[in-house]
């Protein structure tokens, strides 16, 4: 049939896929998009927007593709759109929430599957194709556990961000307002691998994977354990953020130190800037982010670069004695013109 991709898939593979489908979706698909909309009490247009916002390709109205779980999810979405409901949200906001979930879940399941495949490949000495076939056979044993962990982690992180938000708004005094004012004051920066492209060209696949995994895992451990958060990783770079400047200073100095020691040392450079940002789609934006991006480019291997305002804030902080701050030579930054970076070093030992 048109649109189906079953070429090369044998009965055993189809049985395995059907088993995954039943475990994850509760049953085999039996409803069309038109029937889904009818069962959920919504319009076909709403059902189409729902499915697209969930991150999936469009399906024709008469294609059998949905289950009762999809009906329940669409009904929940319709409740959020219902103006008589206490939890009603604007249509655009509902779609934004769905996109946030779908984008995160798409990356999460990919990450989980690739971790499982890599584990099987290494432990059982399998090639990539064999490891994926074994993963397809064994993934069902992890589904319930991963689902429970997902619910737990979501609740933990929601509780954490609500706590941080409460503390932040409680500490705010009277503040300037205006349509062009970035609402959040944050301390953030980048840490990237020096000469990554040149270094990667001479590395094997295994060595490159080992280096990137070591870089990302160390970055996540140091950043989160010291009270900051990872905004995103970009291959050879990581962006971190904190609500507190001194926490951010502790994080970036500790991370640069940690990455550059031991047998697997990686030469890195970093930046730190305090300023106003806006948060959208799980990311942060604004001139502060742009400046931090340019400052890391100006840093020497092993160096950390700040702007003057951030440097002065650290110098006048209660923990000024822990750091050495110095003015650097003027540089030309792309899109910003001439800027004068400042350096940051720790004078006291890194706390464990």
Where are these regions (language model features)?
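Arg/Lys-rich, alpha-helical DNA-contact motif
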Residues: 1-38, 43-173
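Residue-level signature of catalytic and energy-coupling elements of molecular machines
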Residues: 50, 219, 235, 272, ...
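Catalytic NTP-binding/metal-coordinating core of nucleotidyl cyclase/transferase enzymes
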Residues: 174-252
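A generic structural signal for short hydrophobic patches within well-formed alpha-helices
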Residues: 196, 248, 277, 310-314
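Catalytic core of nucleotidyl cyclases, primarily class III adenylyl/guanylyl cyclases
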Residues: 223-249, 258-291, 340
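Solvent-exposed polar/charged
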Residues: 224, 297-298, 316
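Catalytic-core segments of nucleotide cyclases and related cyclic-nucleotide turnover enzymes
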Residues: 278-300, 305, 332
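Cytosolic regulatory/linker segments at or just downstream of nucleotide-handling modules
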Residues: 302-352
């Amino acid at each position: 049939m048109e649109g189906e991709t079953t070429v090369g898939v044998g009965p055993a593979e189809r049985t395995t896929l059907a088993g995954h489908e039943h475990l994850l979706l509760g049953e085999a698909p039996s409803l069309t998009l038109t029937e889904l909309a009818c069962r959920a009490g919504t319009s076909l247009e709403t059902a189409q927007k729902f499915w697209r916002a969930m991150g999936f390709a469009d399906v024709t109205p008469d294609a059998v593709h949905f289950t009762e779980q999809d009906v329940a999810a669409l009904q929940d979405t319709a409740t959020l759109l219902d103006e008589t409901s206490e939890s009603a949200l604007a249509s655009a906001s509902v779609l934004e929430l769905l996109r946030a979930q779908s984008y995160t879940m798409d990356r999460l399941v990919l990450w989980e599957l690739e971790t499982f495949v890599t584990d099987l490949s290494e432990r059982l000495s399998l090639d990539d194709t064999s490891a994926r076939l074994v993963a397809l056979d064994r993934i069902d044993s992890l589904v319930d556990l991963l689902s429970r962990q997902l619910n737990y982690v979501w609740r933990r992180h929601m509780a954490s961000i609500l706590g941080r938000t409460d503390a932040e708004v409680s500490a705010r005094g009277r503040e300037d307002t205006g349509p062009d004012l970035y609402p959040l004051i944050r301390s953030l920066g980048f840490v990237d691998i020096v000469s990554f492209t040149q270094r990667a060209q001479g590395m094997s696949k295994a060595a490159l994977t080992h280096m990137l995994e070591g870089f990302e895992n160390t970055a996540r451990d140091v950043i989160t354990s010291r009270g900051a958060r990872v905004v995103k990783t970009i291959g050879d770079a990581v962006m971190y953020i904190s609500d507190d400047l001194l926490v951010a200073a502790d994080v970036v100095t500790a991370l640069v130190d940690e990455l550059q020691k031991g047998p697997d040392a990686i030469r890195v450079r970093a930046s730190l800037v305090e300023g106003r940002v806006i948060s959208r789609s799980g990311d942060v934006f604004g001139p502060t982010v742009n400046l931090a991006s340019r400052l890391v480019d100006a840093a020497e291997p092993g160096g950390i670069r700040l702007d003057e305002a951030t440097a002065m804030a650290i110098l006048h902080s209660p923990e000024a004695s822990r750091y050495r701050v110095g003015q650097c030579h003027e540089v030309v930054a792309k899109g910003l013109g001439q800027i004068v970076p400042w350096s940051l070093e720790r004078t006291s030992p890194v706390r464990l």
